[in-house]
Amino acid sequence: MPKKCRHLLQTSDLSLDEIKLLLNKASVYANDFNAVSLETKEKMHNKIIVALFFENSTRTVSSFEIASLRLGAKIVKLNMQTSSTSKGETLIDTFKNIHAMQPDAIITRHAFSSAPFKLAEFSQCPLINAGSGMSAHPTQALLDLLTLYQHFGGLENLKGKKIAFIGDVKNSRVANSNIKLLQRLGLEIMLCAPSSMLPSTPLRTTHNIEEAIAFADILMSLRTQTERHNAPIFASLKDYGNTYCITQKRLSTHAKNKEIIILHPGPVHRDIDIESAVLEDKRSKVLEQVKNGVAMRMAVLEFLLSD
């Protein structure tokens, strides 16, 4: 095991030059998943990566698994519902036991915001945060940035662009990571949600989706995270969607004189977060985000493991 290693717990762990390096490498992989150099394949060939997901995941865990395999590494994905944590073993003890088996990297997701930072204290191999509570999801922010980088033609073209986050911003680790990263790159940010879904923030906010659409070059829709709510905020998700769904009508009325793109980290609540017709529209970049998830996670794993 390496004596020194890098972790990726939040986007601030990366310098701007490192972010540019990841974007360049991920762009190559997004264009061709098989464009892995022989040198990289040789370095990754005997690497063993463990995925410890204590929360459900479809896109993130699958894309990390595919990214690992495309690089030539092996990945062990543990089912935490059938692990010893269900018998009362603590998070720290589970991690220490897996760590004792000397994997080359560990990818973790947990409901507690502090979990990856605590685990990093014990880790002598690269630790990647695949989502921690409401705090951080760095690889999601990086793949979203890759999607913007591709669409607008480089980082230099992102400065001054306007992005509106619409939905459950307060409970979204995706929004939190994206906001911190995009602020570093000079984007203007607006948050749009009912009061109960907005964090305390100096950023510009609105309760009006029409205002957000008129403001933005980029819309980032967010799922309503009812599992993190102490009490119902709306009578139903349909009632929420009536007020905050991104629809063709709203776009044609309030974004008719400009190009606008729409992102969502998934899972999408169709006709609640985004109207089905909008999801199929060329302005929707949702499936590009999914593809870019594999490419960016390939770049991240290569960056952390190609020693």
UniProtKB/Swiss-Prot annotation:
Residues annotated to bind carbamoyl phosphate? 59-60, 109, 137, 140, 266-267
A Pfam family: OTCace
Q: Write down the InterPro entries for this protein, in alphabetical order.
A: Asp/Orn_carbamoyltranf_P-bd, Asp/Orn_carbamoylTrfase, Asp/Orn_carbamoylTrfase_sf, Asp_carbamoyltransf, Asp_carbamoyltransf_Asp/Orn-bd
What EC number(s) would the UniProt record show? 2.1.3.2
* GO cellular component terms given for this protein: cytosol
Top-level taxon of origin: Bacteria
GO BP: 'de novo' pyrimidine nucleobase biosynthetic process; 'de novo' UMP biosynthetic process; amino acid metabolic process
Pathway per the UniProt entry: Pyrimidine metabolism; UMP biosynthesis via de novo pathway; (S)-dihydroorotate from bicarbonate: step 2/3
Sorted alphabetically, the keyword list is: Pyrimidine biosynthesis, Transferase
Specify the enzyme's EC class, one word: transferase
User: Which residues does L-aspartate bind?
Assistant: 87, 173, 223
Question: What PANTHER family does the annotation carry?
Answer: ASPARTATE CARBAMOYLTRANSFERASE, ORNITHINE CARBAMOYLTRANSFERASE, MITOCHONDRIAL
Q: How does it assemble?
A: Heterododecamer (2C3:3R2) of six catalytic PyrB chains organized as two trimers (C3), and six regulatory PyrI chains organized as three dimers (R2).
- Briefly, what is this protein's role? Catalyzes the condensation of carbamoyl phosphate and aspartate to form carbamoyl aspartate and inorganic phosphate, the committed step in the de novo pyrimidine nucleotide biosynthesis pathway.
Q: Which NCBIfam families match?
A: asp_carb_tr, PRK00856.1
Q: Which HAMAP family match?
A: Asp_carb_tr (MF_00001)
* Protein name, entry field: Aspartate carbamoyltransferase catalytic subunit
- Organism, by scientific name, is Helicobacter pylori (strain G27)
UniProt gene name: pyrB
